[in-house]
Regions:
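Conserved helicase/translocase motor-coupling segment
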Residues: 1-57
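Conserved RecA-like P-loop NTPase helicase motor core
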Residues: 44-165
């Protein structure tokens, strides 16, 4: 799997450096599972631009316009087995869709008009050992958002949702 993570890292760097419309590091946002994050250290993704898949209820990333979603999301197999044993259908693709949309909406997609927001700059360690986010107030406006999704399944789920055709 080292070959896979190296290949994915190279593809991610290629997206951020060559394909993205905005190549500034400050505009990047990416995610993967936390235990895979270590494989991307030193990449062009930038450690400061990582945003956990579970992050909710924040506007601090409203200036991010170049996104990379490095997850192929599935339910925990134990949860699926629990519901399956009770003849309850669990919507697997809808779960994946919900996660990717919620994560994407941490970015500039949530910006409807020009506004000021507090954006994340860095982590600061307080004297008592607490980790505190250092923010800066900036003006943002709606911009085009690009997203790199290497998983064919996740791309298809997202495309099918946005380009749903009732025919």
């Amino acid at each position: 799997s080292n070959i896979i993570t190296n290949s994915l890292r190279k593809s991610l760097d290629n997206f951020f450096n060559n394909q993205a419309h905005d190549k500034r590091s400050s505009k990047r946002m990416w995610t993967t599972f936390k235990n895979f994050r270590k494989y991307f250290r030193g990449s062009r993704a930038g450690e400061r631009n990582f945003l956990s898949i579970g992050t909710r209820a924040t506007n601090m990333y409203g200036h991010k316009t170049v996104l990379a979603y490095l997850i192929n999301r599935f339910h925990n197999p134990d949860i699926l087995q629990f519901f399956s044993a009770r003849d309850i259908r669990v919507p697997v693709d809808e779960y994946a869709l919900s996660d990717i949309i919620q994560w994407m909406f941490r970015s500039n997609l949530r910006i409807e008009r020009e506004q000021e927001i507090d954006v994340f700059r860095e982590w600061k360690i307080e004297d008592n050992g607490d980790k505190v986010a250092v923010t800066e107030r900036i003006k943002v406006e709606p911009e085009t958002v690009e997203i790199y999704i290497p998983s064919y399944r996740m791309r298809k789920i997202l495309k099918d949702y946005f380009w749903f055709d009732e025919r």
